[in-house]
Amino acid sequence: MSLVCSVIFIHHAFNANILDKDYAFSDGEILMVDNAVRTHFEPYERHFKEIGFNENTIKKYLQCTNIQTVTVPVPAKFLRASNVPTGLLNEMIAYLNSEERNHHNFSELLLFSCLSIFAACKGFITLLTNGVLSVSGKVRNIVNMKLAHPWKLKDICDCLYISESLLKKKLKQEQTTFSQILLDARMQHAKNLIRVEGSVNKIAEQCGYASTSYFIYAFRKHFGNSPKRVSKEYRCQRHTGMNTGNTMSALAI
């Protein structure tokens, strides 16, 4: 799968010309680099270690976080951060690049931690979303950052620096629409919340619905069952699983 960006940990200072501009990079500095300009750093690879991030990792990170979207006039091609515990970061990157990386959940948390170093940087979200390969993917990632927000087509266009007519055209080429992407994202989030949240009112609110009754209508139309029915099915599945586990334990004794 294609890389979206890389996090680079500089262990030896160097000077470089990136995109026709001279830069001085310091020992211990951390960079997030758009994959489109990654080749500009290749001549200096002996000065740094890095970890790459593919589209799936970026999508999941954006879904799991709640970072506000901030538009910037010109999308950054790389971001810089400092005052990071370099010893810890060095060990994290070494582990993520090693063959010992066999604990998926732990590795994923480390990857998310590397990305979060840049969360306060202006242009962070723009860099990530611009790296997602499809237009529908970019829209989905923006929506997933805050599903409770009353998203409008104009909001998405502002984030992507694109006109409403052009965005509609591009989404049509990918056989989808903004409304469909928003609905799918909210319904999937609702289905996940039902596993842990008992209040339909709260779920509706967290998914961006001002009206609980309309949320229930939309959920039933999307999944064929009401939220309460799906919640009950999940509880039954958990109960059955627990009983099976207890039976197996008793047999083992």
Curated annotation (Swiss-Prot):
Keywords on record: Activator, DNA-binding, Transcription, Transcription regulation
Cysteine-cysteine disulfides: none
PROSITE patterns named among the record's database cross-references: HTH_ARAC_FAMILY_1, HTH_ARAC_FAMILY_2
Domain HTH araC/xylS-type: 137-233
GO molecular function, one term: DNA-binding transcription factor activity
Record Pfam families: HTH_18
Function: Induces the expression of gadE. Could also regulate the expression of other genes involved in acid resistance.
Protein name in UniProt: HTH-type transcriptional regulator YdeO
Organism: Shigella flexneri
Lineage per the UniProt record: Bacteria, Pseudomonadati, Pseudomonadota, Gammaproteobacteria, Enterobacterales
